[in-house]
């Protein structure tokens, strides 16, 4: 340790460059670690194009899977066609009727779809069949105006094969009945989706508030580094772990610069000496060496504090980013700049630089303590806002 201290004392610029290099390498290593952890998921959630139901499938089958709800194949090309041949499209014996049992929350009366033969009379049903056949056999005079010609032809068939009054009334009543049932299903679907969004938002907020353990440890380490700098500024060149070490000097109150004896100060000094006497000799020696090393390399301690703040912000992520973390990092950067200016000026440094450095260290210590203690409040996502329907928009 003494050899490293002597080397850094001879080459302060090299020591600073080495500290900055270690900081950059550590930050790059953490960034590469986070990028490497972003692996593709094994499963993903897909939505059926036919029944609009969500299903969890393997990640490799996200564009080729069968829906377990409606048993339809979901796999499409860029032009909208299927990405594989479907024999059931042209072989009738491969198709079967799909039926499902209603869920516990399903309405007591499910949707009932009736055919035109049940809803219409024999004459109107025959007319509708003839109209469909004639529309299927329609051939336009000009292929470029196919849409216009078939619309005119459809209107002509509607006028020719009008429904009788009883059938027209039955059709209108049936349409109103289906509209009511579909509206109830739509409202129920929107309500369930809103409940799912609220549950997801609440769980996401709960996970966003809790900071990881490594982030809390890094914030505490930054506070301890700043507390060490503040303590060294208060003690000056003295070592508090040395035998017979005094307490931090107090401001003089007399006109001649000498402070009157204080019983509280004397009692505190005696208690500190007794506490040091309880420590083993080798432990006290290690503490003295660590104090001397940190006191002679305060710029390295400042670089360590700045590195811990940056790593804490990087590991916390954008969701848990707080203003106090950014403010603490700015104070650490300012403190590093003041130490660099003091080392550059050396003997010609002005007196106000020490005052500014002590004030910045005190403020950084206070902000670091607040950032280390207040670990439950995060910016997180905003308050949940329910989606508006198309009519409200």
Curated annotation (Swiss-Prot):
Keywords: Acetylation, Angiogenesis, Cytoplasm, Cytoskeleton, Glycoprotein, Membrane, Nucleus, Transmembrane, Transmembrane helix
InterPro entries xrefs: Ima1_N (IPR018617), TMEM201 (IPR040041), TMEM201_C (IPR018861)
One Gene Ontology term from the biological process aspect of the record: positive regulation of endothelial cell migration
Record topological domains on the Nuclear side: 1-214, 320-323, 376-393
Compartments it resides in: Nucleus inner membrane; Cytoplasm, Cytoskeleton, Spindle pole
Sugar attachment sites: 256, 263
One protein family per Pfam: Ima1_N
Membrane topology, as annotated: Multi-pass membrane protein
Positions of modified residues (N-acetylmethionine): 1
Keyword Metal-binding assigned: no
GO cellular component, as recorded: cytoplasm; nuclear inner membrane; nuclear membrane; spindle pole
GO terms assigned for molecular function: actin filament binding; lamin binding
Primary subcellular site in the record, as a coarse category: nucleus
Region (Disordered): 246-266
Signal peptide: none
Chain ranges on the Perinuclear space side, renumbered to this chain: 236-298, 345-357
Highest taxon of the lineage: Eukaryota
Transmembrane segments: 215-235, 299-319, 324-344, 358-375
Coiled-coil segments on the chain, per record: none
Similarity-based family: Belongs to the TMEM201 family.
Role this protein plays: Critical regulator of angiogenesis and endothelial cell (EC) migration. Promotes the migration of endothelial cells, which is essential for angiogenesis. Interacts with the linker of nucleoskeleton and cytoskeleton (LINC) complex, which plays a vital role in connecting the cell's cytoskeleton to the nuclear envelope. This interaction is essential for maintaining cellular structure and facilitating the movement of endothelial cells, which is critical for proper vascular development. Involved in nuclear movement during fibroblast polarization and migration.
Assembly with partners or alone: Interacts with SUN2 and LMNA. May bind to Ran GTPase; has a greater affinity for Ran-GTP over Ran-GDP.
Name recorded for this polypeptide: Transmembrane protein 201
Gene behind this protein: TMEM201
